[in-house]
A protein has these predicted regions:
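Hydrophobic transmembrane alpha-helices and their helix-loop junctions in integral membrane proteins
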Residues: 1-127
Length: 127
């Protein structure tokens, strides 16, 4: 990690942006952000309750942790350039998760969609 942190700031802005987008796509899938959040409600609805608690309560936090440790620290220039786009995606996640949760009858799907909304707040705070 230290080697990457030393090399990436010296690279061109376009290369930094490619690295940033690559990491962000991976971490946005893990931390369910719109538009790549669709795996969470379906997975939590069919999983056992204990597994759903781990999915929604613990494992999804890895995505936001990765955003902080990898995206912000390794590519600070690209992170600064993309902050408005990330904030827009975060607000869309907040609204989409909240509105989608209102129409759910299954408790685990409801929790999953509120989790999408909560992760939108986390990403908004990060950027």
């Amino acid at each position: 990690m230290d080697t990457l942190a030393a090399l990436l700031p010296n690279l061109s802005a376009s290369v930094q942006m490619v690295v940033f987008v690559s990491f962000m796509v991976a971490f946005a899938i893990k931390a369910p952000m719109v538009p790549v959040h669709t795996w969470l409600p379906d997975t939590a609805a069919v999983a056992r309750p204990g597994t759903s608690v781990l999915l929604v309560g613990v494992l999804d936090k890895i995505g936001t942790f990765g955003m902080i440790t990898m995206c912000l620290q390794l590519t600070p220039g690209a992170s600064a350039s993309a902050k408005w786009a990330m904030c827009v995606l975060a607000v869309i996640s907040i609204l989409w998760g909240g509105l989608s949760a209102n129409g759910q009858n299954d408790i685990m799907r409801l929790v999953s969609y509120t989790s999408v909304s909560h992760f939108g707040f986390m990403v908004l705070g990060i950027f």
